């Protein structure tokens, strides 16, 4: 798996869509504006779901935008090679997304009033989702066995590096007024009130009917159908594993007892200082 990594500042990235030159340029030269909003996650943490929610909030629940425009055009990834230059020349408030850890994030953000929403998810479920997703991307190439993927994840040798370091970096900024940290599990458990919290953070107000439209259009099944219908717009043929289950606790169907114990030990060692209120998972 190591040969498939593009190593940037000690972080392993996929070799597709990313380049050392662009990542460093994003960090050092990309100008984040005060009116920008950026959705940040570690991969497979509910990224697509949160993107859809924010887009629907901005359109007052009207699904036209999310139905007619693919996600990467609505919320472009800052670090993608093709997106960086497009975003640089885009005028007005920008809605963007990123998977970058804080040490590679645009430096200009930290002196701006731009808003970041960071979504954290049970790393056990992140591991399982990533295992299925990244293996599916291989399409005919040799798959990474579950045991090896598990070990790589704990060692920070999976795409985008250590989950623990990524989460720790962003969580450490949670007291800043322009950063909102949410958990996938809480969003799943209490979607309505979590959306209200997002609205308050963004300065958006939804009438009751508009909120109901947002809730209707972010159900897992509707989002999956929407992605399938958009496959012709973007040549997406992998919607079935981009959105696999959308559930919590799936790790219990994959971890052995020994793996669960090993993960618990690693979590206690590496995440001891994390705020416990974020860990609403089983």
From Swiss-Prot:
Record EC number: 2.8.2.34
Catalytic activity reported: cholate + 3'-phosphoadenylyl sulfate = cholate 7-sulfate + adenosine 3',5'-bisphosphate + H(+); glycocholate + 3'-phosphoadenylyl sulfate = glycocholate 7-sulfate + adenosine 3',5'-bisphosphate + H(+); taurocholate + 3'-phosphoadenylyl sulfate = taurocholate 7-sulfate + adenosine 3',5'-bisphosphate + H(+); chenodeoxycholate + 3'-phosphoadenylyl sulfate = chenodeoxycholate 7-sulfate + adenosine 3',5'-bisphosphate + H(+)
Inducing factors: Down-regulated by PPARA agonist Wy-14.643.
Effect ascribed to mutating residue 99 to H: Decreases sulfotransferase activity (at pH 6.27)
Biological or metabolic pathway of the protein: Lipid metabolism; bile acid degradation
Source organism superkingdom: Eukaryota
Activity profile over pH: Optimum pH is 5.5.
Tissue expression as described in the entry: Liver (at protein level).
The keyword Cytoplasm is annotated on this UniProt entry: yes
One Gene Ontology molecular-function label: 3'-phosphoadenosine 5'-phosphosulfate binding
Keywords: Bile acid catabolism, Cytoplasm, Lipid degradation, Lipid metabolism, Steroid metabolism, Transferase
Residues the record lists as binding 3'-phosphoadenylyl sulfate: 44-48, 121, 129, 184, 218-223, 244-246
GO-annotated cellular components: cytosol
Extra remark: The short isoform L-STL2 appears to be a minor form. It is likely non-functional as it lacks a conserved C-terminus region required for PAPS binding and sulfotransferase activity.
Function description: Hepatic sulfotransferase involved in the maintenance of bile acid homeostasis and energy balance. Catalyzes the transfer of sulfonate group from 3'-phosphoadenylyl sulfate (PAPS) to the 7-alpha hydroxy group of primary bile acids to form 7-monosulfate derivatives in the pathway of bile acid elimination. Displays high catalytic efficiency toward cholate, chenodeoxycholate and their glycine and taurine conjugates.
Similarity-based family: Belongs to the sulfotransferase 1 family.
PANTHER family found in the cross-reference section: SULFOTRANSFERASE SULT (PTHR11783)
Protein name per Swiss-Prot or TrEMBL: Sulfotransferase 2A8
Originating species: Mus musculus
Gene transcribed to yield this protein: Sult2a8
